[in-house]
């Protein structure tokens, strides 16, 4: 198990996700030190955690295990005078890979540790080394069923589904 020291999780947003936000008139924003580039890459700083990577040639599954923390940053979605904030993400790459986080509506806590995104690691490329960092790229990120229900209820729609593809993740991680 390796303690995670930092770097970033970047998600290249899928065109379908951006189109869905636009059709719902949802305005995305960032929280804390998260960024959203004009090229559609949403980036969150990694603040800690631990991770173990097993060679995919072995029988160990899932071959990435642990947790990766993103305290103090997140994503906001606004429309019709309502602002939903999804923040303090925790990536769990193990069995039933997902991202959990805290949910706020107009500044008030709604849910702590909600299952926000589902991860499909079957699309993950082999780990690469980049200087002092390890790069895990290719995991597909989807809106979770729980998050879809929450967003639909909040914004009065049924358009957000649990299979809505958010994008492709790239984690750049350093150890402590």
Where are these regions (language model features)?
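Extracytosolic secretory-pathway proteins
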Residues: 1-79, 83-176
């Amino acid at each position: 198990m390796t303690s995670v020291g930092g770097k970033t999780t970047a998600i290249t947003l899928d065109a379908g996700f951006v189109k869905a936000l636009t059709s719902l008139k949802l305005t995305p924003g960032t929280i804390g030190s998260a960024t959203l580039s004009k090229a559609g890459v949403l980036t969150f700083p990694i603040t800690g955690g631990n991770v173990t990577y097993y060679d995919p040639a072995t029988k160990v599954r899932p071959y990435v295990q642990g947790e990766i923390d993103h305290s103090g940053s997140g994503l906001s979605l606004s429309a019709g005078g309502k602002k939903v904030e999804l923040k303090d993400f925790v990536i769990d790459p193990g069995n039933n890979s997902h991202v959990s986080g805290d949910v706020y509506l107009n500044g008030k806590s709604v849910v702590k540790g909600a299952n926000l995104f589902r991860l499909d690691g079957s699309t993950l490329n082999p780990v690469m080394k980049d200087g002092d960092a390890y790069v895990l790229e290719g995991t597909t990120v989807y809106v979770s069923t729980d998050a879809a229900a929450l967003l639909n209820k909040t914004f009065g729609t049924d358009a957000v589904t649990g299979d809505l593809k958010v994008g492709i993740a790239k984690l750049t991680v350093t150890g402590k």
